[in-house]
């Protein structure tokens, strides 16, 4: 029986710290961030769908949010100011992220990989869904900053 270490590798998310360059009241793991982003993404999509009548898939976006930073298991968390410093650097990091997502997908059986690749790459999402996921990601960061501001670490 062949072993597929995909889930074992994703289990490492709980040990990968985010926000390495910022003070924090407590360390936030990649696992916590992805759960927060998934909850926020699902809620934003439900609002978009039910109130504004958009054709988005809340469940698909929520699952994609669970994997949206999975490549950081292999790459680490690059600070946002560095990631967006210049277009060549941003493009290079996007290529590194895409390669890491491909590497993660390769840890699955072929039959499963076909259904997972779109979540790992974000390719399963429409442009509107991608925007909502990005908004959820940013809301998660804003909430983290608000909590930091109101904590003893501020």
Question: At which residue positions do the language-model features occur?
Answer:
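Histidine/acidic-rich helix-loop-helix segments that form or flank divalent-metal centers
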Residues: 2, 59-63, 109-147
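Short alpha-helical hairpin
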Residues: 2-20
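Alpha-helical phosphate/pyrophosphate-handling elements in metalloenzyme active cores
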Residues: 25-59
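Active-site alpha-helical segments that house and flank conserved acidic catalytic motifs
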Residues: 39-45, 59-78, 134, 138-141
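Histidine- and acidic-residue-rich, metal-dependent catalytic cores
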Residues: 40-42, 95-124
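Aspartate-rich (DDxxD/NDxxD/DxxxD) Mg2+/diphosphate-binding motifs
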Residues: 75-87
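Divalent-cation-assisted or electrostatically stabilized phosphate/pyrophosphate-binding catalytic cores
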Residues: 85-99
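Conserved small/polar residues in nucleotide/adenosyl-binding loops
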Residues: 149-154
């Amino acid at each position: 029986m062949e072993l597929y270490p995909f889930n074992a590798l994703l289990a490492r998310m709980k040990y990968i710290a985010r926000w390495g360059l910022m003070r924090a009241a407590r360390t936030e793991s990649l696992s916590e961030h992805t759960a927060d982003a998934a909850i926020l993404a699902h809620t934003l999509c439900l609002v978009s769908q039910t109130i504004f009548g958009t054709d988005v898939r809340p469940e698909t976006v929520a699952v994609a949010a669970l994997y949206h930073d999975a490549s950081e298991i292999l790459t680490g968390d690059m600070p946002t100011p560095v990631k967006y410093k210049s277009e060549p650097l941003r493009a290079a990091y996007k290529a590194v992220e895409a390669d890491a997502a491909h590497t993660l997908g390769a840890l699955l059986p072929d039959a499963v990989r076909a259904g997972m690749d779109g979540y790992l790459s974000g390719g399963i999402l429409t442009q509107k869904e991608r925007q909502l996921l990005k908004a959820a990601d940013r809301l998660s960061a804003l909430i983290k900053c608000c909590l930091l501001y109101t904590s003893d670490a501020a």
